């Protein structure tokens, strides 16, 4: 049997979990650092798809709102080609047909807007061969492109960093889709072994948080890669508030389920109730009812419910739980705003990844396993899991900061989400890498997505 520490070491040895800095004293060293991280990220993403057991797993839709996994396997490679050509860094496409098929996903859909289009998907082997060609092309560009430090967002190198961070995003979203496939379609992969400890959840409590001025927004000369929505300036004076010491655990959420929370429209707003009735949800998405008790679905296994792990729900479920919990406690409970989350993060004194040295202070970046872990495993100041474990929904729909500018190479990354339909998630998760784990990161999804 392989020792768990060996597994963790193998994961960390294979992958740089923190984002690349844009500055440095030696351009050639930076070139080789980028080459290494590109290949690590590209290979890690491919290894995630080793979970797929058979040819049917590649083309079966995990959920109706998303493409099958064969699309996402090709999509991240096609992204490099499309963006590099758009920026004028390559003249000839590698495979125009595949680059058309894999160009755009279906992530911006309402929960009842089902994609019924029939696609003639290529074979996994054909996509693997295509990915090999893309890997060679990007590696060649890394060798040939002139490099001046620091890298700025109008540098050709920004496109390569964009491709790396884009693949990090899809590593996470593809892993979620795999959790929604039938178990018969997937098998375990050692590099993605889950956390193996569970127990009774601690009693949650509200802790006082002092008010104060919170400032958000990156400067253009920031030394970490950022998506366009991170730049600009925002500040807000917060009044004192209280916040939960721990993330909501499966055990804490169970009371809502057992009290009929999924059957009582009183706890749901109009959007949430529409989703509840359409989806016919009766419990969190990865909970599996069993005659011997609840079980939890992971990527390639089910396990007895780890009650002290955080519950994984969408924003509509989280808001409904808060309304229900308010009546149980007499407190006015709700999701935090983006400003409040950032204020908590600031007060925790948690540094971004540059200050971590060899110790990762959270369940993030596959550093502790490929699953959530107990909600009391990683103290961060007075609170736990302000970073890592699972993403934290906020009540804030994403919006542009004053000074926001669209990045011309990826003009549809953020702007389509400025529709009041996409709420921000903060903090990253156990599988978040690179930019996703930074406190300035601003990722937003429709409120019914997991």
Where is each model-derived feature located?
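Disulfide-stabilized, aromatic/cysteine-rich ligand-recognition loop
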Residues: 3-66, 74-79, 86-147, 153-182, ...
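Intrinsically disordered, low-complexity peptide-like regions
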Residues: 1-4, 361
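Functional-site microenvironments in short loops/helix caps that host divalent-cation chemistry
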Residues: 163, 167, 177-226, 246, ...
